[in-house]
Amino acid sequence: MTMTHDLSGTILVLGGARSGKSTFAESLFKACGSAAYLATAEALDTEMTARIARHQSRRGNKWTTLEEPVDISAAITRTRDPLLVDCLTIWLSNLMHLEKDLEMETADLCQGLQDHDQPVVLVSNEVGGGIVPENKLARRFRDEAGLLNQRVASVADSVYLVTAGLPQKLK
């Protein structure tokens, strides 16, 4: 049985590492003539450079790529096309590294999503299902990621959890 998923409103796609969440999120745009891809990752090492290249080659040329590691609220506001944001947890890591006010940044993001008049799909890692991290920074990241996902899910029209390439609609 093939399920169809509509691209409308704000959609949050959650999943673990290599769960297929980005591939699923991209598939939501297959009926779009054009779309924007907001990348939050920076190519700071060879592994991340290779990961970014894989994502770019998979997407094809209908996408306009915007690179914004920190101020994604402003980037969402400027974009007039359907938009894919990949990924919120890398954005969170960038904010933590810069010691930004996470509550304020998340509130700005949620407001921007509510004000946006085009579909927005956001990809984020679900990191809270494993063991308690050993170090303080990793525990804080896990906790902040959980809070971020909750806040975005609360304003999203739809939420999916992707496991082993299989999307489950939660909301």
Indicate where each model-derived feature is located.
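Short, well-ordered beta-strand core segments
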Residues: A35, L83, S158-L161
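Short secondary-structure boundary segments
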Residues: G15-G16, A41, C87-L88, S124-E126
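SAM-dependent methyltransferases
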Residues: M1-S8, P82-V85, E105-Q111, P119
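Charged, low-complexity C-terminal accessory regions
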Residues: M1-L12, L38, Y160-K171
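Conserved P-loop
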Residues: T4, T10-R78
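Helix-adjacent hinge/juxtasegments
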Residues: S57-E105
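Residue-level signal for inorganic ion chemistry
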Residues: A25, H55, L84, N125, ...
